[in-house]
């Protein structure tokens, strides 16, 4: 297990109250030994003007997952800050929900790199994102 901080899904979701994460309807759904998952609805909150999932909403889901996963790998007195994010969009989604799966590519003392893959309800890859973070403290 890679996690140094232990939080329940209920506690993870409580951190979203009053934030963009809550506004977008993102909910943490699974904390595995080396992965963090969350879902996000595809609706008017996350659509672009043409009725499809907004790429920025996908990036927000990815950064939410990578940042929280990074935080969970730090010790007391440490935190992580995002330094770079990229997202490749593979497939349009117009309704339902998407699921993001976040796993580490690199966990160093001063930097981390996370891969976040976003799937539609049929399990098809919609977006591949990479988030780099700096470990502070």
UniProtKB/Swiss-Prot annotation:
Keywords: Cytoplasm, Hydrolase. It is an enzyme of class 3 (hydrolase). The keyword Glycoprotein does not apply. The active site is at residue 63. Pfam families: 4HBT. One of its GO terms (cellular component) is cytosol. It is found in: Cytoplasm. Its main location: cytoplasm. One of its GO terms (molecular function) is 1,4-dihydroxy-2-naphthoyl-CoA thioesterase activity. Homotetramer. Dimer of dimers. Interacts specifically with the aryl carrier protein (ArCP) domain of EntB. Belongs to the thioesterase PaaI family. Pathway: Siderophore biosynthesis; enterobactin biosynthesis. GO terms for biological process: enterobactin biosynthetic process. The lineage of its organism: Bacteria, Pseudomonadati, Pseudomonadota, Gammaproteobacteria, Enterobacterales. This is Proofreading thioesterase EntH. Its EC number is 3.1.2.-. Coiled coil: none annotated. It comes from Cronobacter turicensis (strain DSM 18703 / CCUG 55852 / LMG 23827 / z3032).
